[in-house]
């Protein structure tokens, strides 16, 4: 009821194509899937395709976002976890990112420049700390038990929402001052490549 979709039949394990232009492409997937039809006013993210071609979409979405109370509610109608662990197709990441952006259009922190960065926001003594953790590596490769080298990220563009202009932005542990701009209750700056872990 809250999702405002109609469920069609029962869920089943099938092989099909899914994605879309906003997801950066179409990816093949074999997984458990529930067909649904969105009602009027429901936002759709991604579609199921009969072929790996934008000309052949079905009427079934990958995910939907619907207004609910003062916020929004979203759902994916297929299990992408196993497929992601096996294929690591960026289409899966993009679909999830797009849904999160629809739910949280103005996040506290935005990081662009790499898909392999985990961000942890902390606050202490009226200061904000952004932990940038390089998460690259063969985490999902069962044949790799350990590795001793990570690929550095590229430079990262970061925007952070704050109601007051900070006195300074520093990169730790080096203490390097980072140039930043402040406009519209957001600061924007660029962080040099992260080898393992950096703090701003």
Protein language model annotation of sequence segments:
Residues 1-200:
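A conserved amphipathic helix/loop scaffold
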